[in-house]
Amino acid sequence: MRNSSLISLCLLILSGCSGSRPNDPPELTVDNLNLALQYAVDQSVIPAATAFKTQALTYQSVTDRFCGAVNTAELAVLQSAWNNLYEKWFHLANYNFGPLNDDLVFAKYTFIDSLRVRGTNYINTVRDEIDNLITGSESLDETFFEQQTFNKTGLLALEVLSFEASGGAQSAVADDIIEDFANNPRKCKILTGMARQLASNADYVVQGWQLQHKDADLPYRTLFLDDQLDDGSNNLTQLLVSVQEHLDYLNRRNVLTTSATLSGMAWNGFSGAIDEIEILLEGNTEVSFLGLMEAGGFSDSVAAVRETITTIRTAINTRNAELLETNIAKLDGHFKREIPNGLDVELGINFSDGD
């Protein structure tokens, strides 16, 4: 009996000394990469899309309330809601694929952020359109706003409507904006109509990820995790390239100086983008992309990525544009080289490509 107990104890000790233990860090394997990718979708991509939709609906509700009581207090609420919407967009803009970018001509991202299309600031086009609609006679119904071209709608149009008076003066003084709305009843119809359309576009993205993507019977989440993408590319490659392209766009198109010029929210947008990228890379306590890189022997690369993100935060906090530009470019490079190399991913991109 004693010998039997001793043998059992020895076997138990030996079994505890072999294989992986519960507290061991995950190894860089295909299964763990797939698990990290699932976490990325469920804890980063879809939450970013949902948060943007939620804030779009909040902004839409605020426009209705503002137009029911046009005063400076409600204007402040309206502008604050737009600021939050803009920041949420920069979280989601890292993931410009799937439902957000599923049409060569009418991709939803173009109707949300026209600057992303080719780096053109369409503010004067938007101003002219608003002036024409205020004095026009066309029916400002749902169909009208659904048919608006990308360069006359979206976040930019809502910023112009929320932060300045129409007409040649383009005053940013709150009392002037209030007077402009009071004197031009159609302006509230323009505001609420465009807000409703943006919320509809945000909803399309969430529905595509969670319920049904285009003509497929499956949500994009399922298609993405099963590696059944529209263009035949690899899912992890698509994710990494999407983030890299957003970083490239931020510098190449001078987003810091060309975006959100009326609200002054561009720095906040950059902060939102970096917050999201860190969430994506760090994952959770079970598995993360950076953790898998460390497990694969790329600790130096991980340290470099984390240092760059920290420096970007310093640049944002101190409003150091030169430092920000330099380190956004560094992080762009990390997504081209260190991160895919550390995850054993072939990107297949031309490093000279831009947005």
Task: Tell where the protein language model's regions lie, with residue ranges.
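C-terminal motif of bacterial Sec signal peptides marking the signal peptidase cleavage site
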Residues: 14-16
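Generic alpha-helical segment signature
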Residues: 1-2, 151
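Sec-dependent signal peptide recognition
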Residues: 2-9
